[in-house]
Amino acid sequence: MLHPRARTMLLLSLPAVAIGIASSLILIVVMKIASVLQNLLWQRLPGTLGIAQDSPFWIIAILTLTGIAVGLVIRFSQGHAGPDPACEPLIGAPVPPSALLGLIVALILGLAGGVSLGPEHPIMTVNIALAVAIGARLLPRVNRMEWTILASAGTIGALFGTPVAAALIFSQTLNGSSEVPLWDRLFAPLMAAAAGALTTGLFFHPHFSLPIAHYGKMEMTDILSGAIVAAIAIAAGMVAVWCLPRLHAMMHQMKNPVLVLGIGGFILGILGVMGGPVSLFKGLDEMQQMVANQAFSTSDYFLLAVIKLAALVVAAASGFRGGRIFPAVFVGVALGLMLHEHVPAVPAAITVSCAILGIVLVVTRDGWLSLFMAAVVVPNTTLLPLLCIVMLPAWLLLAGKPMMMVNRPKQQPPHDNV
């Protein structure tokens, strides 16, 4: 016979697995549709018209039209395509299900159109809303917070292809009764995360790791180098933190989302022309291309880091539906490669991983997630102790500093962004 504790944990196991699978399937369908549309917009259509896909005209035109299209969706869809991600944390309160269709359409358009945002925030919003709405009907005794936790865990597992990130994140957020062991509280979320990760793995494998030279042995000087790199990344990120609310307020004085996003798309197009195709989209595939291109110089990496960070701020300030983690990782990779080219004595494994740690820490203010992203992009067990040590001064630098979020106007309800 199972202990009552075990029976309690098993109660939510089946819903957790179902939510994890559903979270992954929603992500897969959205990404597949976005991929097909992206291929149409950036490969087939310019080829048919006899236009180079990397021509300045095409980049500016597609991003401007993408902004107008997303603005129309936000303006006229029911629920106005959900909350503005610039005003929301990664895991937020459930939104009305009526807003989800517009949110999904806005996300797909942004992903396909080359906007420098990832899918994580809108997908998280969709999955939480569906889990809460359906779960409340099927199991009304389970509170909304439980469904929110399961959906967010399943989504994190699906996004990163592993339940490890969910385990790290929720180990610091599940502050339930001290009488209940932590792993009892983690059981159902980890079931959801594992189901999400395994389902994603059946269709595709998220590829984060970069072909960077192996780091052999940690030296004391490497800790100092890593801390300096992380501090540089944090300084760059804090510039974006300062710019985001000010640019958001300035752009949203126009009130009309079609105009705001159209202008935002045009600015993104100009940035895309400056940075080239590698500076577009969410950044994961593009950072692989950046590392593979041996022709990039120190100034090229610096330019890509600045342009991608600027594009991230513009896209978020304009109200595009998307997340900030994936493009921030791209910025970290570009910044790390630039610093390695500038000071070759510091291994690229250190500069890239510590730059990712610093910039993701600014964006998420989550130490575990920052460590995870740095470790999966530069997978080297020798780096783990160094990253844990470098995290300490990085965390001190950010203590009490503003987050990369916009304070929502008091008169604006969470699901209305017109």
From Swiss-Prot:
Membership in a protein family: Belongs to the chloride channel (TC 2.A.49) family.
Residue stretches spanning the membrane: 10-30, 54-74, 99-119, 120-140, 149-169, 186-206, 223-243, 258-278, 300-320, 322-342, 343-363, 371-391
Pfam families linked: Voltage_CLC (PF00654)
Subcellular location: Cell membrane
Listed PANTHER family: CHLORIDE CHANNEL PROTEIN CLC-E, ION-TRANSPORT PROTEIN YFEO-RELATED
Keyword Nuclease: no
Protein name as catalogued: Putative ion-transport protein YfeO
GO molecular function: chloride transmembrane transporter activity; monoatomic ion channel activity
CDD domains, per the entry: Voltage_gated_ClC
Membrane topology per record: Multi-pass membrane protein
